[in-house]
A protein has these predicted regions:
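Helical element adjacent to the flavin cofactor pocket in flavoenzyme catalytic cores
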Residues: 178-241, 245, 249
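Short beta-strand to alpha-helix junction loop
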Residues: 44-50, 129-133, 144, 186-210, ...
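Mobile amphipathic helical/loop "lid" adjacent to a hydrophobic cofactor/ligand pocket
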Residues: 52-53, 57-172, 176
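Conserved flavin/dinucleotide-binding core of flavoenzymes
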Residues: 302, 307-431
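Beta1/beta-strand and adjacent pyrophosphate-binding region of the FAD-binding site
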Residues: 1-9
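Glycine-rich FAD pyrophosphate-binding loop
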Residues: 18-39
Length: 431
């Protein structure tokens, strides 16, 4: 079995297939595995992320997460007010009703309108509109009585965290489904865990170690130039150096803009499955990691309103020294930040950090990293859902996976892992 792409989706599929005794080779054009998750910040884990927790457990990383406490979700509003969303250990819907009632980030009027909407939703009177996937989230929130202050503050901050874009750029349907899954389905669902490690240390290292134990072959710095097809099957892949590989099954774990150029033009033009990939677009991401000479007692996640960066994570530096801490500053959907110099991005991150985590004296930076991704995640625009492909393609031995495929989730870590699992299951079901 040949897997194109060594990101999380491809590695998850490789793990599932190799665990069942199949011979698997992973092709990665980069110098390392992990794709966009290489050097990514700590994952924001909710109980609703079932596929992610399944992978964590299979890798033995639940030993890391088990002792971790709930990480409160904080909002730093443009007024300077700090609001915390309460995690209440109560059964659903009581936890949702009480949590919404007590949440100070929304005015009493906004809370009342939200509770009225939730009550109608639970009773399905009236049923939810059928066109939410094609509507803009900002317009939909207005229609259920959310004020401009609420939309530009709390809801916009959540939209950037969960879907990677502001309200005016995302699908109302996907936003509502994600909110419901993450925050409105019981006390366990709202428990939030942020491990004090980046994705590479927390997931990629143990995942790579397990793949090596299972005998999965990894080919790094290997650039595929073309996927070759017969009338109903993939027959081989050709590399830039003209060498070729064949397999019984092929699974793509590439982003759409890298997959399409590998396909013959006749395949792209003939099959709507591949043709519609051109309708998908991606959003940029900028991440600044600051290693500081200031200790942190616990992990914090704070959403920022009206700042350069949209949220920050601070956690103790458990990998190097307990008297230091690490701060991650993230900005999504802001292409204007990409050409900024490294020094300027670090300065902007320090400015936002001073507001998010005020101290008597500015901490000293021990070291830092800046990551710029022009195409980081699928843009969740209205109407995008209909163009996200399922795992099974028109060709019997060719599967397509990735966070951007149709998983029901935004293009996040959960979506990547779930798509990899589904791709592996689709292959196993036919063997």
């Amino acid at each position: 079995m040949l897997i194109l792409g060594g990101g999380i989706a491809g590695l998850t599929a490789a793990l599932a297939l190799a665990a069942k005794g199949h011979s698997v080779t992973v092709i990665e054009q980069g110098a390392h595995l992990g794709g966009r998750m290489w050097h990514a910040p700590p994952p924001v884990l909710l109980e609703a992320h079932g596929a992610t927790w399944s992978l964590i457990k299979s890798l033995g990383q639940d030993a890391v997460t088990r002792p971790l406490r709930h990480t409160p979700l904080e909002f730093l509003q443009s007024t300077g007010a700090r609001i915390q969303f309460l995690h209440l250990p109560l059964p659903s819907p009581l936890n949702t009703l009480l949590g919404t009632t007590l949440f100070q980030g929304l005015s009493m009027r906004d809370r009342w309108h939200l509770l009225s909407f939730l009550e109608r939703t639970w009773e399905q009177d009236p049923p939810l509109p059928n066109d939410l996937d094609s509507r803009v989230a900002d317009e939909w929130l207005t229609s259920i009585g959310q004020s401009e202050t609420a939309r530009h503050g709390v809801w916009n901050s959540l939209a950037r965290l969960l879907l990677g874009a502001p309200l005016e750029d995302i699908s109302a349907g996907l936003f509502m489904r994600t909110l419901r899954r993450c925050f409105l389905t019981g006390a366990r669902a709202t428990k939030l865990i942020v491990p004090p490690q980046g994705v590479d240390s927390f997931l990629l290292v143990p995942l790579t170690r397990e793949l090596d134990r299972l005998g999965v072959r990894i080919k790094l710095n290997a650039t595929v130039s073309q996927v070759r097809f017969s009338p109903n099957r993939v027959t081989e892949v050709e590399f830039a150096d003209r060498t070729r590989l064949t397999a019984d099954w092929y699974l793509s774990a590439l982003p759409p803009q890298r997959l399409t150029p590998l396909l013959p033009e006749r395949v792209v033009t003939h099959y709507a499955y591949f043709q519609q990939l051109s309708r998908l677009s991606e959003s940029p991401l900028v991440v600044v990691r600051l290693h500081l000479d200031l200790p942190a007692r616990q992990t914090q996640l704070i959403l920022l309103e009206g700042k350069t960066f949209h949220w920050m994570i601070r956690h103790p530096d458990e990998e190097r020294h307990d008297q230091t801490s690490v701060v991650w500053a993230l900005a999504v959907g802001e292409p204007s930040l990409l050409p900024q110099s490294t020094e300027e991005l670090v300065r902007l991150a320090m400015d936002d950090m001073a507001a998010a985590f005020p101290t008597a004296e500015p901490p000293r930076i021990l070291d830092f990293d800046v990551m710029r991704l022009a195409s980081a995640m699928l843009a969740s625009k209205p109407g995008t859902h209909q163009y996200r492909p399922i795992a099974t393609s028109p060709f019997t031995n060719f599967l397509v996976t990735g966070a951007w495929t149709d998983t029901g989730w935004p293009a996040n870590l959960e979506s990547a892992i779930l798509s990899g699992q589904r791709g592996a299951e689709a292959i196993s079901a036919q063997l």
